[in-house]
């Protein structure tokens, strides 16, 4: 086995082992009914990103620890005002995980783990109105290990401005999901693709999206419908008038009255 193949196998098996260990509590939480659930998720690996430490509350991201800047980053500013978390706590956990990773690499039998390919969907954040700013969301789901290369294409050309992404978010089945965002102005002429590369895919996966123009009815159809509606309205008025007149006449008909 080539050295690079061996390292690939090591990465896969170690990542699977670490995810099982640190997401194990999520599996148990799924069997218990609870009003609220908080989740810490942490992993390290030999491929970028080299690690992650984050916290969720009821599946909403609260904060993560920036491993390069060594600081806590809150998803919303209000969270940081209401709660606190020392980044050193997350960094200490990452250091322990790295030590465990090195030990597992040395003791691993290099058994290849399964790479789970992602499921990808693309959708707009808001209802689409041509010419109105919006955000395209690319949701990459149910993949393992947490290694992705995601790019946006507009009319087949690479887009680098107006892009953003989430962290790798844990799932209760030990896999991950992730969001990538693209701010754009919908146009009838433009089309977009979210291009995803992952070890579980034989080739890059492109998920296509383009604005759907509203269906315009021909003028002749609109005219026919308007005329039909007008005719039905007139018929209703005539029928109603006839029924009212008949009702009034029957009320004044002597034969309809009882015996004196």
Curated annotation (Swiss-Prot):
Impact noted for substituting residue 42 to M: In allele DPA1*02:02, allele DPA1*02:04, allele DPA1*03:01, allele DPA1*03:02 and allele DPA1*03:03; requires 2 nucleotide substitutions
Gene3D superfamilies tied to this protein: Class II Histocompatibility Antigen, M Beta Chain, Chain B, domain 1, Immunoglobulins
GO molecular function annotation: MHC class II protein complex binding; MHC class II receptor activity; peptide antigen binding
Domain Ig-like C1-type: 118-210
Residues making up the signal peptide according to the UniProt record: 1-28
Residues carrying sugar: 109, 149
Region Alpha-2, annotated ranges: 116-209
Keyword hit for Endoplasmic reticulum: yes
Region: Alpha-1, residue numbers: 29-115
Transmembrane segments: 223-245
Topological domain spans for side Extracellular: 29-222
Keywords: Adaptive immunity, Cell membrane, Disulfide bond, Endoplasmic reticulum, Endosome, Glycoprotein, Golgi apparatus, Immunity, Lysosome, Membrane, MHC II, Signal, Transmembrane, Transmembrane helix
Disulfide bonds: 138-194
Assembly mode: Heterodimer of an alpha and a beta subunit; also referred as MHC class II molecule. In the endoplasmic reticulum (ER) it forms a heterononamer; 3 MHC class II molecules bind to a CD74 homotrimer (also known as invariant chain or HLA class II histocompatibility antigen gamma chain). In the endosomal/lysosomal system; CD74 undergoes sequential degradation by various proteases; leaving a small fragment termed CLIP on each MHC class II molecule. MHC class II molecule interacts with HLA_DM, and HLA_DO in B-cells, in order to release CLIP and facilitate the binding of antigenic peptides.
Name this polypeptide is given: HLA class II histocompatibility antigen, DP alpha 1 chain
Organism: Homo sapiens (Human)
Lineage: Eukaryota, Metazoa, Chordata, Craniata, Vertebrata
Gene name per UniProt: HLA-DPA1
